[in-house]
Amino acid sequence: MEFGISRKFAFLVQFRFLNCGKDSRGAEGGHWTERSEGSGWSSSGTPDSLVLTGLKNLQNCVSQDKPVCTLFSVPGKRTKPVKSHPKYKKFKNWHLTALIFFSAWVLFSAGCASQKNVVSSTQPEVFANNAEFYASTVTFKESFINLCFAGDIMAHKQNFSMSDYSIIWDGIRDITGSADLSFANIETTVDDFKECMSYPQFRINSDYVNEAVKAGFNVFSLANNHTNDWGLEGIKSTAEWAQKTADATEKSPRPVHFSGLKLDLIESGKMNNSGKDISFSYFEVRDWKILFVAATEILNRPEFSQYMNFSKPTKKVRRLFAEQLRNLRASHECDLFILSLHTAEPEYVFKTEMEQESFYKTLLNEACVDIIWANHPHVVKPWTVVKNSAYRENLLALKTKAISGTHGSNVDETVNADATVNVAESVLSDSKLIMRANGNTISGQRWDPKFNAPETLRDYTGDGLLLNVTFSKKVYTDSKHKKLFQTIELKSSQPCYITTYINSKWQFVIKKLDENFISELKKSGNKVWAEYLKSRKKIMEKTGENTIWQ
């Protein structure tokens, strides 16, 4: 039966009736029979059947002269059974009359609703204290996605001189390979027909970055200040590798995605208005739609910037960039909009200026970006979870509107905080994420660790962050499986600090900066590295997560 009763009488819809028999102590008397597990409703029972059951139970108790329990209870509170009383018989008829009166009133309030309602066993948790919602057939399907965000993949001489690139990633491939999407910024050009080059103009052969792909990384940013280190030739060779990798993995269980270069423009070689557009990657992971854009606000040289997503860090250009991003999302329905931004901030500086923070706020609120993944400083900065303070209120409003629109009930308008929301197109998010810099994932910058001074600024370049985040998506549908709205919630964010360790063979490899690795070093007799990384671990853990509400 579908209900349209007002909220203030909702508690009357949640019944708990007694059955006669022996209680838990073996004494003859009344005890509770729960008609629902936690929610106040069973998956198959209807309100009128509960009323009839209650009538029958009460009649049995009265006829058998058994003690009667309180028939109605407020959700979440249990009323203790009334003990037998000598004067009970004087009141049994009154109890029966009261039950009949309230039962008739509840059934009357239900109106001429259908008798076919069967409530799904998967009901939204926000409905738990609003019993009238349980009479609705609105249900949801929930799914999850796990994302891993790394930092910069650098290629100094110490890195590309190694004979086996695979061992670089052995220490973290269990993390990067298990996430649905693992993100990294490739801060070098890729060219198989040229020799590898280190700072200041980076170039690497594809076998170096292919090992990162094999380690599980499958989403790459190609837009940074080194993208045009080798001019248009370097841009083209990098684009060719990216396209080849994307094509080769397209039908694999783990396809690889790229953003940052304007591949169509690079292939055609034509200078036209397309150079003003943003290139992006738009793909699906199971039932999740992802929109990914990589852009840079800084270049080491001005030439050929039209072949990449380059946005100058001026107020005017930033406004236009935010507008472009907003329009891009409006034309591409997605569950998560992720922006990789190579910032124009100074390197090796931990503080983020207020102007940059203000730009991040614009990207989240006006450009409709969900996740900002920034890099360039080569050190780890704090990251921020931005909570939507109106989320619960708006979620309740959407659910109320959905039920009202589906069942025609006149729900109290005070809970409908957003009456203008188009329920069928609504996507409500509880949190957004700002990563200001995840440091170096691999580099040769800390080639001379200061074991006696681990707080040295240069030593920060040898440590990085893998931030693992899990999102939940709930798609709410009506009884005809028509989508009403959906929610996106950030369920968890787990940091894993990493370090570039130089082993006895002068190989630069990534290790987890944790107690296990430090203990391993101690057991092997490498006390110098053990003590150094113990100090580095304490330093890195000061760089953590903070939460703000807006």
Describe each region flagged by the PLM.
Residues 118-231, 238, 249-250, 255-258:
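N-terminal catalytic scaffold of extracellular/periplasmic and nuclease hydrolases
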